[in-house]
Amino acid sequence: MSRYWSDIVRQLEPYVPGEQPALAHPVKLNTNENPYPPSPRALDAIRRELGDTGEALRRYPDPVARRLRETVAAYHGIAPEQVFAGNGSDEVLAHAFQALLQHDRPLRFPDITYSFYPTYARLYRVAYETVPLAGDFSIVVDDYLDDAGCVLFPNPNAPTGRALPLADIERIVAANPSSVVVIDEAYVDFGAESAVSLIARYPNLLVVHTVSKARSLAGMRVGFAFGDAALIDALTRVKDSFNSYPLDRLAQVATQASYEDEAWFQATRKQVIASRERLVGALAALGFDVVPSAANFVFARPRSHDAATLAAQLKQREIFVRHFKLPRIDQHLRITVGSDAECDALVAALRELLAA
């Protein structure tokens, strides 16, 4: 702490990202990265943009990412004016907190959810309330039907992996006409129903996506928001008051190319889903209680061992999973669905540790 810090900095509890180990060959199952490389078309697009000399890099990128937004809009069947592109979905969410979620009534989100939400709320001084999940970690839809303020939640939820059906999401959006409802769909491609199809009917709906998970571009830092043009304009006003050039040239062309390679996207997405079901079965056989998942991770509780201890023991073997020291979930582990080989290494290590 420094005497030069502002009051808001003194009060912050910053988000703690998953560990990025500096090891040659870790089994890295702690940050929900895709185990497969991005589309070859994305790599080709980067090479073309660079050329032989890298001449393009001396120029600023398109500040509105026009071609990328047009491609993504066409992919989802919406207008480019309904698409906002930002430097990762976390930045997109940050802009939403500033542009759309700061009102007299408190923002509402689940008590067990993405831990950046309370961090942003404190940073931007957005009053908020947490709404308890049910005992099985599902969102209680009836708790959000009173039009009592803005609503934010991931679908599928993180870190639990549970998903709400689209009909329930529509009930929440329809019940809150005077407030913005933000659905964070970082993991939607692994088994949930997207709410993008509802945008045309609900001007209060904002849907956030990322290319970090299903499109294997976490290193590019690209995220999107989809919604009514007025909501997108609000995000753009905040962006242009903060950073007019959030997406670099390489990120724009790589992401555009990835959306143009549907075959690669579908093949890798389906492989992750198949590996998830395989991992769920293996963990259940070891005596874990596994929460039903529609994401690229599983949330599992060891019945006979302490979760934090298991995570530490796995780390000693260079196998990384995520443990959250938080109420209600401190006996669970969030485990990314890696390649089958990575998942096999995890299961083998767990089998030894549980038998010790």
Curated annotation (Swiss-Prot):
Q: Which GO terms describe its biological process?
A: L-histidine biosynthetic process
Molecular-function GO terms, alphabetical: histidinol-phosphate transaminase activity; pyridoxal phosphate binding
Identify the cofactor(s).
pyridoxal 5'-phosphate
Q: Which InterPro entries match?
A: Aminotrans_II_pyridoxalP_BS, Aminotransferase_I/II_large, HisP_aminotrans, PyrdxlP-dep_Trfase, PyrdxlP-dep_Trfase_major, PyrdxlP-dep_Trfase_small
Pfam families xrefs: Aminotran_1_2 (PF00155)
Q: Which residues carry this modification: N6-(pyridoxal phosphate)lysine?
A: 213
Q: How does it assemble?
A: Homodimer.
Query: Which branch of life, at top level?
Result: Bacteria
Enzyme class, first EC level, given as a word: transferase
What PROSITE patterns does the record tag this protein with?
Answer: AA_TRANSFER_CLASS_2
Say yes or no: keyword Transferase present: yes
Q: Which UniProt keyword terms apply here?
A: Amino-acid biosynthesis, Aminotransferase, Histidine biosynthesis, Pyridoxal phosphate, Transferase
- Pathway in which this enzyme or protein is active: Amino-acid biosynthesis; L-histidine biosynthesis; L-histidine from 5-phospho-alpha-D-ribose 1-diphosphate: step 7/9
Q: Does the keyword Acyltransferase apply?
A: no
Protein name as annotated: Histidinol-phosphate aminotransferase 2
Q: Which reaction does it catalyse?
A: L-histidinol phosphate + 2-oxoglutarate = 3-(imidazol-4-yl)-2-oxopropyl phosphate + L-glutamate
This protein's gene is called hisC2
**EC number(s) recorded for this UniProt protein:** 2.6.1.9
Q: Which family does it belong to?
A: Belongs to the class-II pyridoxal-phosphate-dependent aminotransferase family. Histidinol-phosphate aminotransferase subfamily.
